[in-house]
């Protein structure tokens, strides 16, 4: 187990979309690990946050200061960070009861039969590979709502989806889409060994985040434009 508490690292780059005394909303670049873990002890978002916002050091888990939900290192987009213990508890409960909303921009292989669908399939650790998640009978309940928002014929038959997380399991969108045979483009783990089409990472971006502010209880919404690497790739795709 990892026991070393993360230290501040001002060299970690990320954009702050919004900040006040209770919450910070960041736009995470692709390739940035959210918090320290085996193999990634330094240079994580948590280290960068501690350099910019030292007050989060004692919020929540010392290994994951202020962090109340996660994004895979290969994904980009919005993440909310708590600055106080009260804010952390308030936000954690919203992710637990699904009142916080997360919308992702995704590109998948093929065209789903139904333009709108809900993937309701329990997820757990893969029996063959503990680093992978899989649809398993006794897994945790998991639901992903998807809507097809565009289809393309080049560089392959692919579809752009808007995915809403009704639960937030590890790798949920990636595993769910792969389970209906429409894996994410560029996904090295769940991509069913399809070609990368020039993508260096999974085409998955956390585009919208909505929650009730811990103090005012007002509903707040944040948007993030598609990450520049994905946008550059998309500019070359053809309908």
Question: Residue locations for each model-derived region?
Answer:
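RNA pseudouridine synthases
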Residues: 1-239
